[in-house]
Amino acid sequence: MDNNETEPRILLVEDDKADREKTLEALRKYGLGYEVRVVTGGHEALDYLLGRGRFHERSRNPLPDLILLDMSLAPIDGARVLARIRDNESLKAIPVIILCSTPEERGRAMVESVRAHAYAVKPVSADDMRDLVRLTYPSVTSYAAMRFE
C-alpha cells in the first residue's frame, strides 16, 4: 500500500456472478474500510496486476494489498494465476486468499500447493471473511465505510 493511501485495496477475482455478489456482501457487512476492485477472470486479473491493456494506468489501477482469488476460473484457473503472481517479483509478496468450492481438507492442501496465505470455502460468511482478511492483512484497523468500484 502506498504511504499516501489509507484505504487498503482488495482485488476480488471471481467469475461467477452469484459468488461474486455473496463475497462482496460478506465484505460489506462490517464496513472495514477496504477499497474493493473486481475482475471476472484469470486473464483480466493478470492484466490488472501487470498493468496491461485497459489497466495500463497504474495511478488509476493500483496494485492491491490483498487478493481474493477464485480457484475455478476459466479458461485460466486460479492456480495458474497464483503461480504467475508468485513468479513475479513485484507481485509475489501480495497476500492471497483462495476461494474454493472444495471440502475443507482439500482446501488446506491446496493452500500449500499453490502458495496461498489462506483459503475459504464458498459461500463465505461475513464473519469468516472478516476474520480471514484481518488474519491475512492484520494492519487493517479502519472501520470506515467501504467503497466499491
Where are these regions (language model features)?
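Non-catalytic signal-transmission and effector/linker regions of two-component phosphorelay proteins
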Residues: 1-11, 17-37, 43-46, 50, ...
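Residue preferences within the helical output face of two-component receiver
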Residues: 23, 109-111
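Conserved phosphotransfer cores of two-component systems
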Residues: 58-62, 86-93, 114
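Active-site residues of response regulator receiver
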Residues: 69-71
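The feature encodes the CheY-like receiver
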Residues: 74, 83, 104
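Hydrophobic/aromatic residues positioned on beta-strands within the core alpha/beta folds
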Residues: 99-100
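Short, glycine/charged-rich "phosphate-handling" switch motifs in NTP-dependent
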Residues: 117
